[in-house]
Amino acid sequence: PSWGGKVTKPPRGKLFYIPQRPYMTLGSLRDQIIYPHTFEEMKRRGKTDADLFKYLDIVQLRLLVQQREKGLDSIEDWIDVLSGGEKQRIAMARLFYHHPQFAILDECTSAVSVDVEGSMYEYCRQVGITLFTVSHRKSLWSHHEYVFRFDGRGGSEFIIIEGTSDEFGS
């Protein structure tokens, strides 16, 4: 801490990280959403395909499933099949599935439209996922309460966001 206090790391399973280029595993579309869990782990957690469809609706990718004969069981080379924005939206559906207490989002919506991005961030707020976002997009400031800005010369400042967020760069 800069001026005092105690820094603690959340317990395993309470923190989730999504990079700008999310990992796509070999396997079904379902496997992409529940990664690194298996289908058996998904069932043990009490999750169903209906839950996955809910997450796909939030990230506006239900059509991706409907376009495939085998639906969630479709197996493709997802790293090549999905666009950059679709991969980022699958990663957000993955976040919703795992439902951690905290999430670090590292430019993870850079290829997603502002309206879909807003829906995803709003859902995180609704379900109580605390977000730490690394981004240059001005559109994201409205989804946060604080900014920790680095100046590129070793300095930083902690800012409470009040009202509009136009002052925080693009």
Q: What kind of feature is each model-predicted range?
A:
Residues 20-21, 25-27, 57, 64, ...:
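Conserved coupling/switch loop of ABC ATPases
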Residues 106, 110-117:
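ABC-family nucleotide-binding domains
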Residues 1-54, 118-128:
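Conserved post-Walker A segment of ABC ATPase nucleotide-binding domains
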Residues 136-166:
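H-loop (His-switch) and adjacent beta-strand-loop-beta switch element
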Residues 123-143:
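Conserved catalytic loops of ABC-family nucleotide-binding domains
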Residues 18, 29, 56, 92-93, ...:
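Hydrophobic, well-ordered secondary-structure elements that form the walls
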Residues 25, 43-47, 52-90, 96-101, ...:
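ABC-fold ATPase nucleotide-binding domain signature/coupling loops
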